[in-house]
Amino acid sequence: MVKLKVLSPNGTLFDEKIEMVIVKGAEGYAGFMRNTQPSIFAINNSVGYITYPDKTKKSVVIENATLYCNKDLIKIFALDFVIADNLSYDEIMKRKKDLESKIKDTTDTKELIRLQHALDIELLKLKEAK
């Protein structure tokens, strides 16, 4: 087992012992577990997968992150990290509609990019919501 700790600007989002985490970077998916060589890995906005000690697996949605690992600890510094089981389809659809409305009404390029990024994250969450 290895400890996975996820930190964000809003505090600690996850802090548990796991068997493995699989995340997606620019070059594809990579898995990290106990005794992995020390590494730094950039994570794209993507879906990752956690395997727990009891062999259950859960999907997670990760927003712009960097992973650091050594043999006993994996740290992920992310803007957001949400376990798919905790996602609400109705809440995501509401945020999606709000963002689409704002995008339609926005003329500022910087704001449009920010809103589009937020919409991309909501669409990723929508794929994983049950």
Swiss-Prot record:
Subcellular location: Cell membrane
Keyword Cell membrane carried by entry: yes
Membrane-spanning residues: none
Membrane topology: Peripheral membrane protein
Gene3D superfamilies named in the record: F0F1 ATP synthase delta/epsilon subunit, N-terminal
Main location: membrane
Keyword vocabulary terms for this entry: ATP synthesis, Cell membrane, CF(1), Hydrogen ion transport, Ion transport, Membrane, Transport
Function: Produces ATP from ADP in the presence of a proton gradient across the membrane.
Subunit structure: F-type ATPases have 2 components, CF(1) - the catalytic core - and CF(0) - the membrane proton channel. CF(1) has five subunits: alpha(3), beta(3), gamma(1), delta(1), epsilon(1). CF(0) has three main subunits: a, b and c.
Name of protein: ATP synthase epsilon chain
Native source species: Mycoplasmoides gallisepticum (strain R(low / passage 15 / clone 2))
